[in-house]
């Protein structure tokens, strides 16, 4: 027998996974696919159909993602308690089950209040998935320091994989829903995403259990003042506020520019593919930069990605159709390659500058700041788009916010982490 008397029956599987950090990171990355892509990013694929079907204003459509972000903020604020009470691995898996259920239930309603409530609940539970997974991947990366950047990159690249899954599933379900005569064809997509989320949760269960995590400790003297990393935190707030406008409304803007469903799907897949390979693109930078430089670079690139569609929505008649298409694909490629790494950059900053006993608390702070930015972003972009020149103006404002975030993050210098 290979098991000790107090080992669970599955300990051989878990022990094997503990010796396979890359495979473990891939399993954990499904949490990013679920908590970020299915729960949050997929909504952009529903926006054009829901707007056409329900006649909602951009403000109302944006408010659905604001509700999701509010739930995410509440989940982030309670994250330390949840992880202390249930452990990172359990909160990761339980959050995955609940998030999947709430996603599926979105297909049962057409009232904005009901859908908004479910978006709030899915945001609340997805915080345990995404941020809980962040704690797990930080522990895994700490145990394998020579591959730290790669492991962090793999985890956050799960968002790209999830985007590809969404791009393949949601348009297909919209077509099938229409062919089957459903009154609201987009509802089928929510059912399928819920089922997909449950499958992902099952697949990430064992990898999450294989990461050895000591219970988080809370002491009165073991803390680092937030002012020490206020600049990168402010830059991360701007990231949350700026990126979400693009993510919420890019498909609606492309539809306004005359793109058909096939082109929209190809564009979204492009973002997902670049996100999937962002681990290889950014792994060295995540290991090299100890301060806010990585986030500053990413915010700058994301701002450029926002400016491109904003510019062509205002002045597209001055360029040929092919030029517009190529530039928009460049925008999507930049956005996909940078999106997940912005989050990874803050995790890397925490790992580089804080002792392990402070990781949960610091991740909670960064997640809460990020979520606050996400609350403001979609509704602001939607309101501007309804009242001040359309989606183009909203995208330009998002770019300005991201440029400000880049400047703030650049000011952040590393500091010597005390011994754990």
Mark where each language-model region is.
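Extracytoplasmic gate region of multi-pass secondary transporters
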Residues: 43-44, 228-269, 273-276
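Conserved MFS/SLC helix-loop-helix module at the cytosolic interface between two early adjacent transmembrane helices
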Residues: 74-110
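Helix-to-loop junctions at the C-terminal end of transmembrane segments
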Residues: 75-87, 278-291, 385-386
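Paired small-residue
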Residues: 102, 113-122, 326-334
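Cytoplasmic helix-loop-helix junction between adjacent transmembrane helices
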Residues: 118-158
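C-terminal membrane-cytosol helix-exit motif in multi-pass small-molecule transporters
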Residues: 170-171, 194-214, 408-412
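C-terminal transmembrane helical hairpin of 12-TM major facilitator-type secondary transporters
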Residues: 292-346
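A late C-terminal transmembrane helix in Major Facilitator Superfamily
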Residues: 351-388
